[in-house]
Amino acid sequence: MAHSASPSLYRSPQEAMEAPPEEFLYLACLHEGTGVDAPDFLAVVDTNGGRVVHELPMPNAGDELHHFGWNRCSSACHGPDRSHLIVPGFRSSRVHVVNVADDPRKPYIEKVIEPEEVVAKTGYTRPHTVHCMPGDNIVVSMLGDADGNASGGFAVIDAKTFEVKGRWENGGERPPMNYDFWYQPRKNVLVSSEFGEPNAYEKGFDLADVEAGRYGQRIHFWDLERRTLEQTVDLGAKGLLPFELRWLHDPDSEEGFVGAALSSVLWHFHRANGAWAADPVIEVESVPLEGWPFPVPGVMSDLVLSMDDRFVYLANWLHGDVRQYDVTNPAEPKLTGQVWLGGVIGKPTDGPRELNGGPNMVQLSFDGRRLYVSNSLYSSWDNQFYPEMRSWLTRINCDPNGGMELDPGFFVDFHDRPDGPARAHEMRLQGGDCTTEIFQ
């Protein structure tokens, strides 16, 4: 059981796996790029009925809601329970503090941190990943400076007052770029990845920008207590655009995974002889396609690790498949399941309906049985690669012993809406999920 004072915070992965099934989830939905002149919104989706039961619009248009997270998670399990979602605008650099404690199914905006304040106190823009940390801190990875150039730092927000406190890193060397991050308290380490320069990716993808070094290929290891950069691992040509990082949930582990989106390679990082190393363990082959100037890469856009660290699920946004691998031995993953959900290479879609777009974000329930999938990556990239995109949220049923199949009864359509189409991006499950919880 969870702590009595913190009913949705857990002392161990096993405790989280025993939590009741989620009844609803929160979903970041955007109008940016759709032609609809309206603010983005946070949707509340009933996971039993597969329908939107509440929408919380942001106060301004043009935010590009993307990733978001809790003010508290299990790494701070000895304090108050989670009560707020921190919802940044990836394009606007505006940060919304959303109260989910008073009525979890009808959240409301409690505070808005304007981009001018973020820049004044940190010098950073383009907030991405949100993680709570012990000590009443919320840490947010920041991808740009005030002019849209690449930057490799982090912002800190007070988890009680929601005031911006400044930069997280403690001086010294900083990476040239940033994107996702994860940390292991017992091992005193934080790892961060790289996307690219906002001035490059915001306008759409151009291969020339990769060749010009405007996109990343490195992961970085930090001393968590000292908040200083300790080591950088360059992944090279097989590590282009290292997006999402997933440390094993075991708090004593010294290994995890990162997905290189453009190279479509899953890397296994680990500590070896006192230093950090990374090895490619899954390589998704590019597919020749008529009309394309180069073979189509999978674009490994997201991955999630089951709470028991047995399975990793990854999405290939352009190819259109979601894969399940047994990673009992993290250095030698074994494919155990695959579902097709759209894509550009012409594979038939599993299930009762044709899908436009490809699987982008994935989120897994604590018990490892329900995998939620959405299809918007980033507005300008959506329009470039899927100009006729119709956005959706669907669910895959996962066998905890291996294997998975599409749930034909769960489908949320975000295209045919009274106010015009929207696009679905990241999900947060009621009471936490497999990419929010870090254990001490």
Locations of the language-model features?
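Short loop/turn segments immediately following beta-strands, especially the blade-tip
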Residues: V44-G49, V97-Y108, A159-F162, D223-R227, ...
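Short, conserved, GDST-rich strand-edge loop motifs in beta-rich repeat architectures
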Residues: A19-P20, L27-D37, G79-S83, V87-P88, ...
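Asp-box/WD-like beta-propeller blade repeats and closely related beta-sheet repeat scaffolds
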Residues: V100-P185
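Beta-propeller domains
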Residues: G171-N178, W182-P330
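Beta-propeller blade signature
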Residues: D40-D46, S151-F162, D209-R226, P387-P400
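Structural signature of eukaryotic scaffold interfaces centered on beta-propeller domains
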Residues: H3-P21, L65-D81, G123-P134, W182-N188, ...
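Blade-loop segments of beta-propeller domains
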Residues: R51-T129
